[in-house]
């Protein structure tokens, strides 16, 4: 599933992308969040934006050199674990980010509470997000809050 976000009047507006043509018609997204993608969805992103996202099975490598690096094309690649505080099966979910000049791409296996909260806040508070870097920073600060709350319950 591809969720595409654009800024409208200082707020994040979300659009779900169901096919390649829908993806190609968007010219100014600031965040593209890819959840449990099909192989063809990753290909659409590559064709539309020239960005190769890692496949989910490739996210397992979390050696120091794979956590954060700048590629030859100038894109910043970051891999991070986010807590999923599920009562039955609490666990970490690995997320890969690719930050280009003006778009944040994220890819992960399942939707995360932190991501939902960031989307909600950015829709309700105009001006809280102005660009792709703001989205990334907001994801990390919200993750710190969520992780602290989860650990308090232990």
Question: Which positions does each model-derived feature cover?
Answer:
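Peripheral, non-transmembrane regulatory/ligand-interaction domains of membrane transport proteins
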Residues: 1-154
